[in-house]
């Protein structure tokens, strides 16, 4: 049953302060999951307030270094690491991520031992980092467990990682904070073993960007990462993180305009991203999709063969197609082949369930036209 939205008789900042105090009251160990972005910076200062109120000493902070992070962001995180009120754990673990170039996908291992031997790491691992060797692993393959399993090590009792997730950033993040009636902002990490007593807390889920920047600058007189100022000057994307996956790499020119030297190094390590930089503005996505969809299921197979460049991706794609095909047989209008191709080459399909074509898309218009043609043909 749907519930009507209720408004609080307090500001979003005061509400977040109540939530974060509740987190400290509820859990034995509380850590701030820090990325260098403005949202996690706001979380850091909210936690600082609680630590000063209660005399808890330095704030425990976790930073997951993903190697391809902007140099400006890395410098800011290192500056925060040296604050006397911060106790930071800096993790550099080998995790598989995606490199997407004009519809073609391949897995890339962060902090790869092979790329290190080839001199193709974007930068060297900092000497203070916690790395695979600390867990008896190597950098030649991805860590076997979810990363939260490793960052959780050494924490006592029930543990909460506080994150800067905000609901208005995406529908996925919105859904993550509306699934529970009580303590809706406290959730379990995705796919983490239930035996591990770790939860995520998202106390600023109802903030907007203006709330974040005002809180940092006016209430604490603090600074945020310089990257946001650089991005604002060039009209670039306001996001810190890896720029290689299927969504962020479409704004590669924004990252390049903000930090051209960083792109030079990215090009040295992954020369094929230059094709994305040069050709994306003229890339005809619809023709690319229609070319595969017109061949039916043979076109789907060709799409996988030509665009999934690593064996693991091919296996995941084939499983996704098998599930989609079952639904296509039952309802071909809601599950057209063009929508399947679009998900394979443009969207994030790994770890997601197959879904029908959604509104506000070109495939949705095709669906409506197909339904109308069927209705007219059947005389209804």
Role assignments for model-derived ranges:
Residues 1-33, 38-380:
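Nucleotide-activated chemistry modules centered on ATP-dependent adenylation/adenylyltransferase
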């Amino acid at each position: 049953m749907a519930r009507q939205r209720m408004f609080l008789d307090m500001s979003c900042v005061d509400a977040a302060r109540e939530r974060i105090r509740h987190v400290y009251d509820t859990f034995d160990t509380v850590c701030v999951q820090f990325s260098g972005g403005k949202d996690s910076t706001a979380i850091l200062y909210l936690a600082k307030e609680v630590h000063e109120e209660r005399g808890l000493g330095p704030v425990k902070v976790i930073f997951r270094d993903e190697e391809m992070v902007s140099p400006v962001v890395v410098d800011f995180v290192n500056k925060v690491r040296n604050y006397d009120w911060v106790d930071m754990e800096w993790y550099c673990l080998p995790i598989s991520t995606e490199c997407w170039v004009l519809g073609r996908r391949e897995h890339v291992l962060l902090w790869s031992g092979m790329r290190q031997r080839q001199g193709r790491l974007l930068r060297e691992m900092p000497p203070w980092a916690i790395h695979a060797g600390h867990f008896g692993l190597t950098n030649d393959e991805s860590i076997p467990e979810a990363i939260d399993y490793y960052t959780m090590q050494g924490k006592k009792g029930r543990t909460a990682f506080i994150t800067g997730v905000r609901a208005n950033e995406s529908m996925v993040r919105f859904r993550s904070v509306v699934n529970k009636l009580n303590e809706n902002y406290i959730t379990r990490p995705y796919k983490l073993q239930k035996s591990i007593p770790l939860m995520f807390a998202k106390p600023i889920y109802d903030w907007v960007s203006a709330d974040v920047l005002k809180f940092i600058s006016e209430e604490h007189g603090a600074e945020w990462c310089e990257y946001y100022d650089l991005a604002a000057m060039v009209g670039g994307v306001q996001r810190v993180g890896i720029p290689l996956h299927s969504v962020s790499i479409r704004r590669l020119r924004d990252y390049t305009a903000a930090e051209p030297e960083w792109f030079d190094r990215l090009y040295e390590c992954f020369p094929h991203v230059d094709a994305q930089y040069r050709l994306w503005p003229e890339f005809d996505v619809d023709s690319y999709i229609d070319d595969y969809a017109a061949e039916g299921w043979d076109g789907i197979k060709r799409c996988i063969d030509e665009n999934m460049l690593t064996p693991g991706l091919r296996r995941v794609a084939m499983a996704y197609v098998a599930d989609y095909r079952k639904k296509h047989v039952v309802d071909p209008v809601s599950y057209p082949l063009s929508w399947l191709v679009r998900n394979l080459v443009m969207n994030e399909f790994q770890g997601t369930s197959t879904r029908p074509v959604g509104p506000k898309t070109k495939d949705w218009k095709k669906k409506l036209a197909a339904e109308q043609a069927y209705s007219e043909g059947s005389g209804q």
